[in-house]
Amino acid sequence: MRLTKTLLISAVLLMSATGMQAAGFNQNGNYLTVQLKQHQNFGPSQIRLQVVSDKIIRVQATAEQSFRNKQSLIIVPQNSKAKYKVEEQGDNLIITTAAMRAVMNEATGQITFYDLKDNVLLNEVAQGGKTFKPFTVPDREIGVDIAKVPEAQKHGWSWRALFNSPDNEAFYGLGQHQSEELNMKGKNEDLFQYNTKVSVPFVISNKNYGILWDSYSYCRWGNPEDYLQLNRAFKLYDKDGKEGQLTGTYVDKNGKKIVRGEDSIYFEYAMPEASEICNKTDKGGIQNLPKGFALNGSKVVYEGYVEAPTNSFYQFILYYAGYMKIYIDGKLVVPERWRTAWNPNSYKFETPIKKGVKTPIRIEWQPDGDVSYCGLRVAAPRSEAEKNQLSIWSEMSPDMDYYFIAGQNLDEVISGYRTLTGKASLYPKWTLGFWQSRERYQSSKDIEDNMKKFRDLHIPVDNIVQDWNYWKLDSWGSHEFEAARYPNPQAMLDSVHAMNGRFMISVWPKFYDTVKNYKELDSKGWMYHQAIKDDIHDWLGFRGSFYDAYSDGARKMFWRQMDENLYTKYKFGIDAWWMDASEPNVRDCTPMWYRKALSGPTALGTSTEYFNAYSIVNADAIYNGQRSVNPNQRVFLLTRSGFAGEQRYSTATWSGDIATRWEDMRAQMTAGLNYSMAGLPFWGMDQGGFCVENRYVAAQQEFDKTGKENADLKEWRELQARWNQFGCFVPLYRTHGQWPTREVWNIAPADHPAYKTIVAYDKLRYRLMPYLYSMAGMVHFKDYTMMRGLVMDFNGDDNVYDIKDQWMFGPALMACPIGEYQKYSRNVYLPKQKGWYDFYTGKHYAGGQTIVADAPFDKIPVFVPEGSILPVGPEMEWSDQKKAELIDLYVYAGKDGSYTLYEDEGTNYNYEKGKYAMIDFKYNDAQKTVTIAARKGAFDGMLQKRRFNIVLVSDNNQQGISLAKAPKGKMVKYAGKAVTVKLK
């Protein structure tokens, strides 16, 4: 290679250098900017590269004459010390770091990333890898306060980044979505925030890289175009074969029938009747259902034929509330699904349809409420080559801005993501215990009585949660307890704490317009006004709106109001904050354009540009607010939405108001895995589901009257049992839902197998506390991921890339839940890199095979890989009831292994000052020795002496983990000095 220009540059030198002009690029500080020699239509005019570290390169592109320098909401300040080399050869600009190389064609702008062995990691397509279209925000999306928006903020760019991707590539991340998809290769995903849907602009590849794009608008992964109405994608025929539309048959509960033609199935939203802007600009949604037809209890069928323009696997998206089934070509392509009427769900599916053939279609819908929703759309067909590409589209940004992150493995890639967006906080230890929640405790007596019952029954629990409406009915946003139901909140908090419990409270960014806090925020221009203008009343009958969390002043005021009414007022007795509806969800079931009008304009720009990032700025308000008034108590937030960078604000996300259905349970497995692999480490769900089918409600009511367990109640109890077993192996172990309430004694009697297994897994969770809290330490100090798709630990085994219902929970436990009713065994794939042990029995299996694992009612399969070291602590009823003076240390033979036990004070920030301890363990399989290293570090209250009962699990010593009996092992006394133990 003949080099025409070579520069050895360190970031320190770059910072002092300005305006250096090379043959094809300009170097200013640590930026390398290229003015493209061939400016293609809709392409960039300039590209700017920044070496952030050896493994991270930032790519910016603009279609304008210069870059707009916006302040990032997700990237923390970077102090790069990376050294790199810049070369030019012909039209190529080459940047080489200690870990990788980026090559940009200065004529076309195409960028290719290589490792140092010249293997391509990722490359943009040669033509059209970066495209732009000018974008102007429609007036209706800005809404009533359009006069506040400067003209420049109304204009930006829609952009698309397009990359080649080999057939054997797999993609993960993008946040939490509900279609039971894990590997996103060839899939489409609309990226926006919604109750049960959390979108994160970060994706990782099994090729050991990730892409983080710095955009806050609505985005699309995969197909950059919107889904089509059925009549735009197909020729439609009614059930009699007449061209033009499908047949819609509506039969109400009294037998009244309406039959009409339907050229599309798009009844996906409702509009407020008093909204002038809606009435003028949007005639769609449920207002196009038959006039006067009573949906509740009805049955609706859409049927006929579709004729496709080309042979393809067509990618559909179903939007549904109530019960839904879909048949295409005589096949059941969507088995029955259900969602409550006020919170519809989206579900994606694919099916082949042949060109030019009238293919039968039948959609069966049973609405479940007076208002309900239904929609079916389809993506325009694309070739397999197009589907296989990596495509990212952003609706509105000032420019294209993405970070390429390389690593030796996916942990390193996620570490790079956290280098950019901030380290994860170390959560309070008690958050890893069991949380009891419901919608909702109605009084302080409810709270205290239920906490006391846990203690009386000796069932482990750490946290009890107060959901919404603890305030007076007409005072949402006051943050004040209603005195009649909560006469002495301080006494309630003191009582919970005296029982060694913790207390979390729900706070929404929502305010009725009559409360003092609304008026104070509004006086500064910090409330969204569209909902007030349109006279939107919530389900309780009152009018209100949300505050503008994008304003620094608004965030400080919001926290001050919380502090004055809840936190300092009650002597810091509230342990955690439940930040609900942080999408923000001003009104359910509205079209996207109106959601934007309801949640803007923001202090930073239009809500179109800042549509997805509300939750991170809202989390900023609470995290920094609490630390400003009580700097040494760990903050913890639970939020219904999330975004890149939120981990730095001690925030966990739960998956929203999901349904109590087996398919929803299964969907949470992939939802949690992809959320975790999007770099956000702490996730949970409403164990047991939130929204309850009427059949389960009726079954519980019958049991309460008669004591009889009918078929529906039997299924309900098994669903709750399986979901709680599943929940034991996710970061946040929390039950929550609507009636029937979810305290274990309300799910089933104490002699019922559902009760017994729920309590057993609760106790197991607490026995695993040394393992769990050490994982939390790894998350903070080593950028670890707790809930891990198998690709993270067994990349290279092609069989793991699409496994949706198995994962590693930390380094030692592979959870394999049951997601179907009356299923008492399941296939389990054991990755080939290691052998495996049954967690309960110690039986050994070779890797690289699929086995049929027993899964009786009271257990789900769990397996442990060879080389694992698993600490198991004492039985406890709350997380810090006992210090782990005796730890059963299970060591699994077959591979060398290592593990680090992490401990600190658990609730404060002294770990930031170095007050913590780590003990390293190493297992040598050939010698059958365990070396316990000298303890590193110290903290107040640390155990100076302890015991380890070291249990070697092997083919010859099959020992499982049991709550009933202590394992046989070798007892070692440890006082902080290194010791090596021979196990055989």
Model-derived regions, located:
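Bacterial Sec-dependent N-terminal signal peptides
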Residues: 1-26
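A low-complexity, Ser/Thr/Gly/Pro-enriched, surface-exposed linker/loop concept
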Residues: 25, 29, 48-92, 133
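Aromatic- and carboxylate-enriched substrate-binding clefts and catalytic-loop regions
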Residues: 64, 134, 347-349, 366-371, ...
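Solvent-exposed beta-strand/loop surfaces of large extracellular or lumenal domains
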Residues: 69-85, 328-348, 529-530, 534, ...
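Catalytic and substrate-binding clefts that recognize carbohydrates or anionic sugar/phosphate headgroups
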Residues: 88-241, 255, 314-318, 323, ...
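Extended extracellular/luminal ectodomain segments enriched in beta-structured repeat modules
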Residues: 307-315, 927
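Catalytic core of carbohydrate-active enzymes
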Residues: 623-635, 642-654, 675-685, 690-929, ...
